[in-house]
Amino acid sequence: EDRVLTLTKHICGEGIGIYGIFLMLINAQRFAKMTCLGQEVVAWSARDENQHVDGLTWLLNNELSENPNQMSPEIVNKILTMFANSVERGVALAKRAYQQGSLRDLSIEQIEVFLKQLANARIAQLNIGIDAVFPDVSKEILPQVGVLFAKSTLVNFFEASNTNYSVGSLTGDWVYPDENYQTDHELEQEILNG
């Protein structure tokens, strides 16, 4: 029982709770507010959280298949409560952020609907016999939501090799403090040529 509830807690935290913030950040990008690296970091973060949730869901479903007798109506109710609380906390966080000013073309109500849709999608992936936490929520999807669940084709800067952009960037006379100093290019050539 403890493993099931612990895995569920993490699925809710990583798979629902922070997605209201992701939605707000993605919405800002629609109006040229967080571009370039900021945009990529949000996409990588969402991809990372999706991978965590996929793994946690797999673990939970395996736990349930190996120990089917541990599911009881009481545990199902605890799981439903966790999902509902996660949506409630995500909405509360969005409301807190909106105290500083609302975002263009994104209301608190839209964030709440999105989080409820997400909770429904996440719980449907669990093998507990529940299709939706919020069965009456709208089926209309916000257009910007797809970015959060797209498989990223971007190269994560933590995974990519470094690129040296400094070649030829300095002009004029430059005196190196050490007469034996070699540039990166010179060192590479020395290593390659033996």
Which residue stretches match the model-derived regions?
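Non-heme di-metal
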Residues: E1-G194
